[in-house]
Amino acid sequence: MRRLGTLLATVALVAAVSPIPAGAAAPVSFPDGVASGDVTPVSAVLWTRADQATTLTAEVSTDPSFALRTLRFPESVTASADFTAKIVVAPLVPNHRYFYRFRHDGSVSPVGTFKTAPSPLLPAGVRFVYTGDSDGTMVNGHPAFNNFETLAAARNENPDFFVYLGDTIYADSVFRPTGPAVTLDDYRAAYRVNRGYPNLTDLLRATSTYAIWDDHEVVNDFDSVTVDPQRYANGRQAFLENLPVETVLRLHDAGCRSDPMFRVFRWGRDADVIVLDERSCRSAEVKPACTFANGSLDLAPTLPPPARMQFGLPANPPPGCLAALNDPTRTYLGSVQKQALLTVLRWSPARFKFVVSEDAIQQFYALPYDRWEGYGAERAEILNFIRANAIRNVTFLTTDEHAVMMNQVFVDRFADPQPIAYEAVTGPIATFTSQQQIAAFGQALGDPNLVAKFQGALNLVGEDCRNLNVNSYAVVAVDPVAGTASITMKDSNGAVVHDQLAASTACTAAIGP
């Protein structure tokens, strides 16, 4: 990785000192670096942001000096898209490394690189990283949390690609000096702040990215029904402007706030990466139905009565709560995206199906309202479909919980304890850890033992590995010869994460054959 970084820096330096023609317009700068994404065997999306309206040319070559055959793609950038450029480049050759840059006269961007996916007909190994939850908000000129060191460690893995899995900004961070983002300019500014972290821009430059949003790109825990329409539109526009995501989306669902950003990427014959949009179509939460008469919210409504009493809860949740949580008319994905997911799972020939999920699908009962457990009917439908069709090696790759949590996925851990899939939760990059959040919530409730109770709930469900107090990312590796895949959780120093309660247990998982 160091050799690649040195090469890119050298190429960028040579380009930067090229003379500007006499009489040229003011030099163009590229304050947020470059990025590539949504890579296929034959195409990629290239991204940058200029500092002014202009016409850029994207140059793409297998030669890092751009001296040999170079493809060129012009693109106008305007204030209407905050001077961002997004260019789909094609046709490319499968399983090749490409270098790219943007130019305007003598102004040249940093050089980025990506690798195209191998042909879907051929066996191919793949090694990629994923994480999410990056609050780069500054407090008096200093990071509220850290310098995104987790992303530096992830870059050092030399991954084939990076999955930027939700909460790519915190538009509603408690540390924002002007309060939550509301206007389009507010949201755009949050992306510019995060791009001020070299550890993020260096990773985006060094490999390609598959990105999806979660809630903090708009506002915490938003759904498609109750979200303010203008804030939703502003947050979505800013996300699409600032991430290398293909803007032309292929699914249409009139029942959603907007078309879901569902995509599927094949990496050789062995791996599918299925990206879900779990915000654009979801029904409203049902917290009001799960609130007791005294105004307190049920902390674990789906936990069986004996376990509820063990944790000091009433034997039963409020009347109507479970019916609301399991209402089959409520949706998490929307009917069109749900059917697209089931179709891909059923008919994909890939040995491994990695489902990129913004929120956790495993059961751990505590405050289920904003994740899959809070939409019980659709969750059960998808898991039962996987089981009924004997679909193997389905693995959910997840963030959002601000913790490492690895476990089997069941329809019901107690009533139907047959493993159907696996889930590996990682993160965060830069925000409060789960342990910090739970401790603060417990303090507000007057319960100093809430962290211990949550750990007890994880013990109850037999969590394979957990660490609630670490910044982390995950490394996924597919071995086509052995027919296996592995997932390894690592911290911001690149060290393997271990279970918080069993230090000898490494947070790793083997999938397949």
Regions found by a protein language model. Give the residues of each.
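Metal-dependent phosphoester/phosphodiester hydrolase catalytic core
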Residues: 25-513
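Secretory targeting and sorting signals
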Residues: 1-24
